[in-house]
A protein has these predicted regions:
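Hydrophobic alpha-helical transmembrane segments in multi-pass membrane proteins
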Residues: 7-12, 180-347, 361, 411-486, ...
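Metallo-beta-lactamase
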Residues: 541-552, 580, 676-680
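Cap/insert and terminal regions of metallo-dependent hydrolase folds
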Residues: 574, 658-735
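Aromatic-rich juxtamembrane segments at the membrane interface
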Residues: 117-250, 256, 543-545, 617-618, ...
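Alpha-helical transmembrane segments of multi-pass integral membrane proteins
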Residues: 298-406, 698-703
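Core dinuclear metal-dependent hydrolase active-site scaffold
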Residues: 279, 283-287, 402-425, 429-543, ...
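Membrane-interface helix/helix-cap signal primarily in integral membrane proteins
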Residues: 13-194, 527-531, 540, 588-611, ...
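Active-site HxH/HxHxD metal-binding segment of metal-dependent hydrolases
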Residues: 551-596, 600, 697
Length: 760
């Protein structure tokens, strides 16, 4: 058997994957009451500065009142005062503060903080924390490493401009808490955010450099190897020991061990051993995107090196490396971020070689900046200037790449079976090359076939796949995984807290949004609406309807329109508003933003309609010439018809608007409604008994936030809906609510409780 150790480790990883699939981890429950003040005792295992706070991570935690052991670590947020070294690393402390759990995702595509911190083994946070007692013993080594890191961060702050300092601290010291947000978003959008990860490039450059320096000093090889690995382990501990750093240090140690034992170093075996050791400590790391991307990059470089390799033009080797990494990263990126930066592999042809120069300049900056100013000032500023030039060049390249056509490919999250087929194609290409796709008595001497070489017996040789077949297979796999066809009509009521946002997709793939804002969630556009749209593969909205201009209906849309960095990158073709809109400050700002982006604004009134992809929107309110001083009263009310199913979308309309809409429906001979979006988040001053009696809605959707200060939905509204026999669904209870419409029937699917109900 070739690579027996690698096979054992891979078998372990596969076993872990199967086990996790068959036994998914239950959603963590907060063992202490949310918002309660508690006193905890635990050991300080990590600490770092985040803005004006000291974040301390405690392990082996127990609570005094109520007395219980905490399953997992706790993040404590302390005020960063003059005594920034308290508490010391490795010490046992008692700390008091307010309990805060991690929120779970409530919409498709939304970041799941609860699941993320569950993988990291963190149970909850403690805000407004204060150390009330500290043991005398502590870890001198860990505390020393922390002080070194703080000192080096100070060097960057003194020598570099704030923006450059924040980026260099992230690249060399793993300090991402103060990272410039604009640079972070730009690099992420361009596909070069990997420069912020402490990984193989850092360990290879620093570790091998240090090892070769020791060898030049005639120090015995075993001692050089042990010291070099020890220094890299200390560096990893200092920068936070992420999964990518842990992987790189383990592989570095195995590489030096192979040299000492005079054995051949095998990258794939080292990678498999590193994966097994990490998963033995925490199996759920297998679902961590950082783990997947870090190991995937090395897997692509190692496994696919012979499959995708320029035979004649060696100068194309860097490009072939980017293509190999793309083949492994592509499904991971789509499953995690739902989009792919098309020009990232070209950017990395420049960025990765330049990173060695940037890191070298950063090290000189740190070294010289740590010396007395008389000696180190000039070299530190010179190196700092080089860092600035390189970072400015990176930003310029990223900005230019994002302005190119098709810069960002929004695909959406692929179906699991599509990901499996893509991976199967890549594995088959590897197996076909490694073991031969078939046996031939005599391998062809010319043509496109690649001969593996040694005969297996009686002249038989393994023959690889033709290059054209490889290309066709990869192209077919990429096409398959990037397809995201519409499957009938879908209507999703997003959970935006106290607000409204409705996404509608036609059977033909047209995309519409009705409202998009919240008064209880900040940055709703960035963190909820845009991730949801990209999860569904939406890069362009055919129309956005704003029922009225209250912030809880437009704040997220305004974010998208104000997005100058193009990080949200959702194109809006047209904006539709109520003809009775109040032309106040929000209206003027909206008009200005739309003019800047060249988005036409249409004012709708009763009788107007729009048809697209089998959908029909009909405006029922406001009527022509309707005037009001109330934004809520000016709300658009629309009837949506799709494949024999009808829905009424009401905004925050008030009683007189409901009456006018009801009269129009009655005049048209309309019998009843299937889906009713409750007006004004379930307010008792809307959703009148007369309207509900006329509509007789089969299903009512109420969009409101948990524990909102308005008391929505009001008990009177719920009682009225129950009297009409409506099934009531609330986003505060179920998260996003999706209605799938097919041939006159519809099913209701909820995001949190994962329930499914079929209607009509």
């Amino acid at each position: 058997m070739r690579r027996p150790l690698c096979c054992v480790c891979v078998a372990f990883v596969v076993t872990v994957f199967i086990y996790l699939q068959m036994n998914p981890a239950p959603a963590p429950t907060l063992c202490l009451e949310e918002g309660s003040n508690v006193t905890l005792q635990g050991k300080v295992v990590q600490k770092y500065v985040q803005k004006d706070e000291l974040v301390v991570q405690l392990d082996h935690v127990s609570a005094s009142q109520p007395k219980q052991k905490i399953d997992g670590r706790v993040l404590c947020y302390l005020e960063l005062g003059e005594r920034g070294d308290v508490p010391k690393a490795g010490s046992v402390i008692a700390v008091a503060g307010k309990v805060s759990g991690f929120g779970r995702a409530r919409n498709p595509g939304e970041f799941d903080a609860q699941g993320y911190y569950q993988i990291l083994g963190v149970a909850f946070r403690l805000y407004k924390a204060e150390v009330i007692a500290q043991g005398s013993s502590y870890s001198g080594c860990r505390e020393y490493l922390y002080q070194i890191r703080r000192s080096l961060e100070g060097v960057f702050d003194r020598v570099l401009a704030p923006k450059d300092a924040s980026v260099m601290k992230a690249i060399l010291l793993g300090s991402k808490s103060g990272l410039d947000e604009e640079s972070k978003q730009l690099f992420q959008k361009s596909g070069i955010a990997h420069i912020f990860a402490i990984s193989g490039l850092h360990i290879t450059m620093l570790g091998m450099g240090f090892y070769h320096i020791l060898r030049k000093l005639w120090i015995p090889q075993p001692l050089c190897a042990v010291v070099s690995v020890g220094v890299m382990a200390a560096y990893g501990e200092m920068v936070g020991m992420s999964s990518s750093a842990y992987r790189a240090i383990l592989m570095f140690g195995l590489q030096l061990a192979a040299q000492m034992l005079r054995r051949t170093y095998d990258m794939l075996t080292a990678l498999a051993v590193a994966a097994m050791l990490i998963l033995m400590e925490e199996p759920r790391y297998l679902y961590h995107s950082g783990f997947q991307l870090s190991f995937g990059a090395i897997l692509g470089i190692g496994c696919l090196s012979e499959i995708i390799k320029p035979v004649r033009w060696k100068f194309l080797e860097p490009l072939s490396v980017s293509v190999r990494i793309f083949l492994v990263h592509f499904p991971i990126m789509l499953a995690t971020y739902y989009e792919f930066p098309v020009y990232s592999f070209l950017l990395n042809l420049v960025i990765i070689p330049a990173m060695s120069v940037l890191m070298a300049a950063g090290l000189v900056c740190l070294g010289a900046g740590s010396l007395p100013a008389v000696i180190g000032s000039v070299p530190a500023k010179t190196a700092g200037g080089l860092c600035h030039l390189l970072l400015a060049g990176f930003e310029r390249l990223c900005t230019v790449s994002l302005r190119l056509p098709f810069a960002n490919w929004v695909v959406g999250r692929p179906d699991t079976w599509r990901i499996c087929v893509f991976c199967a194609v890549v594995v088959y290409l590897y197996a076909a090359h490694q073991y031969g796709v078939f046996l031939s008595a005599r391998a062809p001497e010319r043509g496109l076939y690649h001969t593996k070489g040694a005969a297996r017996g009686q002249g038989e040789q393994t023959v690889g796949l033709p290059a054209v077949i490889k290309f066709a297979a990869v192209l077919a796999a990429v096409t398959l995984i990037s397809e995201n066809p519409a499957d009938g009509v879908s209507v999703t009521f997003l959970d935006v807290g106290q607000g409204d946002c409705i996404w509608i997709e036609s059977a033909g793939g047209e995309q519409f949004l009705v409202d998009g804002g919240s008064s209880s969630k900040s940055k709703t556009g960035q963190y909820t609406i845009v991730p949801f749209l990209k999860y569904n593969g939406v890069a362009t909205l055919d129309a956005v309807f704003l029922t009225h201009l209250d912030s809880d209906h437009i704040s997220g849309i305004m974010e998208m329109l104000k997005d100058s960095s193009q990080t949200m990158d959702i194109r809006i073709k047209r904006l539709c508003i109520s003809d009775a809109v109040i032309e106040d400050e929000p209206y003027e700002e909206l008009q200005m933003l739309c003019e800047r982006r060249q988005i036409p604004i249409y004012r709708l009134k009763a009788g107007d309609s729009m048809e697209a992809g089998g959908l029909r929107f009909e405006v029922l309110h406001p009527s022509a010439g309707y005037e009001t001083a109330s934004r809520n009263a000016s709300s658009l009310v629309m009837k949506l018809e799709a494949e024999g199913v009808t829905a009424l979308l009401t905004g925050d309309v008030e009683a007189d608007g409901e009456q006018a809409a009801g009269q129009l429906l009655q005049q048209s001979g309309f019998a009843g409604i299937d889906i009713y979006k409750a007006a004004h988040h379930g307010s008792k001053y809307s959703n009148t008994q007369a309207l509900l009696a006329q509509l007789q809605p089969e299903t009512a959707i109420i969009s409101c936030g948990e524990n909102n200060r308005y008391g929505h939905p009001h008990a009177e509204t719920v009682a009225r809906l129950e009297q009409t026999g409506s099934g009531i669904w609330m986003t505060k209870d179920t998260g996003a609510i999706t209605i799938h419409i097919r041939k006159g029937c519809y099913t209701i699917e909820t995001f949190i409780n994962d329930s499914l109900a079929e209607q009509k």
